[in-house]
Amino acid sequence: MANATPNGSVPHNHVGAVLPTIPTIKIDEKQTLATSEDHTSIDYLQRAQWLRAAVLGANDGLVSVTSLMMGVGAVKKDAKAMLVAGFAGLVAGACGMAIGEFVAVCTQYEVELGQMKREMNMSEGGERDLETEKRTLPNPLQATWASALSFSIGALVPLLSAAFVADYRTRVIVVVAMASLALVVFGSVGAQLGKTPKLKSCVRFLLGGWIAMSITFGLTKLMGASALE
């Protein structure tokens, strides 16, 4: 076995071969801390303001338009009737979601801003703190666009699914299957952006969509059978 020489030279074994030295790996603590700080610096409460509108819009667009198309298909099996009803639901729903979200978030913004001003007036340096705190308030325009755009994306899923299927039964099966897949995807994306459990979110989306579609199809089928025949 090789022994270290007193002058610190590279040790040799008994046959004269140089023993390799194992380099020490140094962890860059500054880089690790910077990565950790970047991850923890994400304001998930700020993200939740537009994420809530986007998740609500996507789920509402998908479920409402799918349910509307299935309801129309329950009494009229024509593909054109289902597509026209779905497109009308997309336009009306996107506009309604955008206006409703804008009014709701504007009201929330005004209430929170008024409360914030009252609290700042009671403390010193309130004007300076007010400008900083206003950045945490919800943005009405951001929520409006997120809601309208996500509603349209969700509503396009059943429309595109039914557009290329001629047979009624096959069309309904394809629409339900694609809507179910989209519900799982929306639930997973929402959970990923909000850092919440994915399984719980996907199950919640899926069950809610199935219940809405079942109720709409069943009641419309019952009404059509009793009133139109």
From Swiss-Prot:
GO cellular component: endoplasmic reticulum membrane; membrane; vacuolar membrane
Tissue occurrence: Highly expressed in the fixation zone of the root nodule. No or low-level expression in root, leaf and stem.
Statement: the UniProt record of this protein carries the keyword Ion transport: yes
Reaction catalyzed: Fe(2+)(in) = Fe(2+)(out)
SS bond list: none
GO biological process, one term: nodulation
TM annotation in the entry: 55-75, 83-103, 145-165, 172-192, 205-225
Keyword Protease part of the UniProt annotation: no
Membrane topology: Multi-pass membrane protein
Keyword entries, A-Z: Endoplasmic reticulum, Ion transport, Iron, Iron transport, Membrane, Metal-binding, Nitrogen fixation, Nodulation, Transmembrane, Transmembrane helix, Transport, Vacuole
Subcellular location, record wording: Endoplasmic reticulum membrane; Vacuole membrane
Family annotation (Pfam families): VIT1
Induction annotation: No significant changes in expression observed in response to short- or long-term iron deficiency in nodules.
InterPro entries found in the cross-reference section: Ccc1_fam
Gene Ontology MF, one: metal ion binding
Function of the protein: Iron transporter that is involved in accumulation of Fe(2+) ions in the fixation zone of the root nodules. Exhibits low-level iron transport activity.
Protein family according to the UniProt entry: Belongs to the CCC1 family.
Protein name listed in UniProt: VIT-like transporter 1b
